[in-house]
């Protein structure tokens, strides 16, 4: 699905759509608030051997084994630090619960269809299929992410394997 068709899908929603705003480095991103289960501080995780660097490991969340993905590593943010501002956004993605590590969470914004622009097309070296679009609030730009497309099916399979090794 292209960014344009995602925008037209939102056009039928008169009150807009709410996004949880989080930061990675100096950039602000937004994900559909309805996917968010909870926000937690970053705790140490159980590392799983032979998984990509962006899969930090798993944690036990009230009896549920939750794979933890560091989006800063996935987006090649360079050296990442874990400090008091580092948080895990726990997402409910259909039949899966996944945690994503981000630099911080700032607020929840409601965007109307008019405030959401199609995702720009970049060179073939940069995949933009996971972008829903760009949210424009005056001078502020928000990169809207489709988290299911960001974590492709191959990566989701790795997360399932990681979680099953601990369960």
Swiss-Prot record:
One GO CC term, this protein: cytosol
Keywords, in A-Z order: Chemotaxis, Cytoplasm
Residue span(s) of domain CheW-like: 16-156
Gene3D superfamilies with a match to the protein in the record: CheA-289, Domain 4, SH3 Domains
This protein's record includes keyword Cytoplasm: yes
Keyword Metal-binding: no
Record GO biological process: chemotaxis; positive regulation of receptor clustering; signal transduction
Record localization: Cytoplasm
UniProt-listed Pfam families: CheW
Predominant location: cytoplasm
InterPro entries according to UniProt: CheW, CheW-like_dom_sf, CheW-lke_dom
Main function: Involved in the transmission of sensory signals from the chemoreceptors to the flagellar motors.
Name of the protein described by the UniProt record: Chemotaxis protein CheW
Lineage: Bacteria, Pseudomonadati, Pseudomonadota, Gammaproteobacteria, Enterobacterales
């Amino acid at each position: 699905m292209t960014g344009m068709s995602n925008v037209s899908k939102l056009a039928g929603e008169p009150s807009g759509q709410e996004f949880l705003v989080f930061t990675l480095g100096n950039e602000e991103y937004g994900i559909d608030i309805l996917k968010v289960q909870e926000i937690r501080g970053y705790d140490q995780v159980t590392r799983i051997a032979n998984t990509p660097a962006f899969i930090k490991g798993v944690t036990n969340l009230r009896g549920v084994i939750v794979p933890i993905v560091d989006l800063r590593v996935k987006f090649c943010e360079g050296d990442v630090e874990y400090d008091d501002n580092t948080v895990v956004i726990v997402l409910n993605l259909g039949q899966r619960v996944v945690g994503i590590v981000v630099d911080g969470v700032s607020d929840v914004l409601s965007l109307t269809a008019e405030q959401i622009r199609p995702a720009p097309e970049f060179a073939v070296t940069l995949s933009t299929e996971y972008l829903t679009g760009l949210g424009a609030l005056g001078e502020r730009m928000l990169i809207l992410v489709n988290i299911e497309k960001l974590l492709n099916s191959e990566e989701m399979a790795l997360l399932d394997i990681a979680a099953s090794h601990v369960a």
